C-alpha cells in the first residue's frame, strides 16, 4: 500500500480532531486504471452504479459493531446484483465510525469522505484512479438542500477534490447534477426499484417510519406512516431537512396539511427538480465523463437557464 493512502485515510478520519496530519507531506502516488464506487445499497449510490461503467469496482462499508442500523436491505440488493449481473460487491467491515466517540460525539462518519475510507485504503489493491460517492444535487448545488450555490467554488470541492487528485484518485460525483427524485428514476429505469431500499432500520421495503422511508422509499411505492414520530419531527423543523426534495414530495403527494405554515410554497415551480444541471458534468474527470453524461442526458432533460433553480432559496432568513 502506498504511504499516501494512509496519510489521506488519516485525514478523512481524524482531521476534525487533529491538526497537521498533512504537514511536511509530499504526495507521490500515481493514478491507477479503474473507478471505484462507495456502494451503500441505498438509492443514491445505486443510481451511481447504474450510470457508471460496468467494470466499476463496487465496495460497501459494513459496520462491524453492534448497531441499530441494519444491512439486510443492502445485502438483498447485493445478492440480486451478483445473481443478475455476475458482479461482486466487496463488503468491507470497519468500526471507524466509533472514532468520534472518543471526542464526545455520536457514532458516525468523521467527515463526508470518511464514507469512502475503505476505497482509499484499498485503492492500490483494486488499482483505482477514481472514487465515486452518491452525492446528489440536494447536497452539491443546494446548500443544506434549500439554497442555490455554485458547488465548484465551495471549500468542500476545492479541499477534497485537490487532495484526492494529488494521490491519483479523482473524486467522481456521478449524480451531482441531479436530485434525489431523479436518482430514484434512474434506479427504476435500471430495473432495481423492486429490490433497493434506503432504509437502514428494517429489511426491504423498510420500516415505513423513518425519514428515508418518507422521502426516498416512498417514491418507490413503499409504504410510510406520515404520522410517525421521526417523520413528523423532521417536517416540523425549519428549515425542513433536505428541504427541496422533501417539499417537492409533499407537493407530489399533497401533504401540505402536514406543513400548513409552508402551504404557500405549493405555488412554487418545482418542475426543474426532475431535470439535470449541466455544469455538474464539468466536475467529472475526462476519462469517465462521457459514459456518465450520456446516461444522465438520456434519463432526463437539462434545467432551463431561466429556471428558478438558479436563484433558489426556500428559507432566506436561515443561516
Kindly label every feature range from the protein language model:
Residues 4, 9, 17-35, 43, ...:
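Nucleotide-activated chemistry modules centered on ATP-dependent adenylation/adenylyltransferase
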Residues 40:
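Metallo-beta-lactamase
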Amino acid at each position: 500500500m502506498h504511504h499516501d493512502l494512509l496519510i489521506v485515510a488519516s485525514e478523512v478520519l481524524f482531521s476534525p480532531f487533529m491538526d497537521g496530519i498533512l504537514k511536511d507531506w509530499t504526495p507521490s502516488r500515481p493514478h491507477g486504471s479503474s473507478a471505484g464506487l462507495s456502494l451503500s445499497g441505498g438509492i443514491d449510490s445505486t443510481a451511481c452504479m447504474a450510470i457508471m461503467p460496468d467494470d466499476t469496482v463496487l465496495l460497501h462499508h459494513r459496520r462491524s459493531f453492534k448497531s441499530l442500523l441494519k444491512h439486510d436491505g443492502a445485502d438483498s440488493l447485493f445478492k440480486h446484483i451478483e445473481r443478475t449481473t455476475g458482479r461482486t460487491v466487496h463488503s468491507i467491515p470497519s468500526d471507524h465510525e466509533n472514532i468520534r466517540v472518543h471526542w464526545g460525539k455520536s457514532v458516525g462518519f468523521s467527515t463526508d469522505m470518511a464514507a469512502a475510507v475503505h476505497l482509499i485504503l484499498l485503492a492500490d489493491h483494486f488499482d483505482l484512479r477514481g472514487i465515486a460517492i452518491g452525492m446528489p444535487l440536494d447536497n452539491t448545488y443546494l446548500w443544506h438542500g434549500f439554497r442555490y450555490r455554485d458547488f465548484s467554488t465551495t471549500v468542500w470541492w476545492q479541499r477534497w477534490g485537490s487532495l484526492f487528485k494529488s494521490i491519483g484518485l479523482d473524486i467522481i460525483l456521478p449524480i451531482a447534477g441531479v436530485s434525489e427524485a431523479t436518482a430514484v428514476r434512474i434506479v427504476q429505469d435500471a430495473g432495481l426499484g423492486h429490490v433497493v431500499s434506503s432504509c437502514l432500520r428494517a429489511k426491504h421495503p423498510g420500516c415505513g417510519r423513518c425519514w428515508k422511508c418518507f422521502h426516498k422509499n416512498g417514491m418507490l411505492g413503499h409504504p410510510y406512516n406520515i404520522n410517525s414520530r421521526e417523520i413528523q419531527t423532521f417536517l416540523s423543523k425549519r428549515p425542513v431537512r433536505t428541504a427541496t426534495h422533501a417539499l417537492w414530495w409533499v407537493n407530489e403527494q399533497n401533504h401540505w396539511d402536514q406543513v400548513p405554515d409552508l402551504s404557500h410554497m405549493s405555488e412554487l415551480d418545482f418542475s426543474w427538480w426532475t431535470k439535470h444541471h449541466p455544469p455538474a458534468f464539468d466536475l467529472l474527470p475526462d476519462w469517465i465523463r462521457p459514459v456518465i453524461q450520456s446516461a444522465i442526458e438520456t434519463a432526463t432533460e437539462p434545467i432551463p437557464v431561466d429556471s428558478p433553480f438558479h436563484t433558489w432559496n426556500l428559507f432566506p432568513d436561515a443561516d
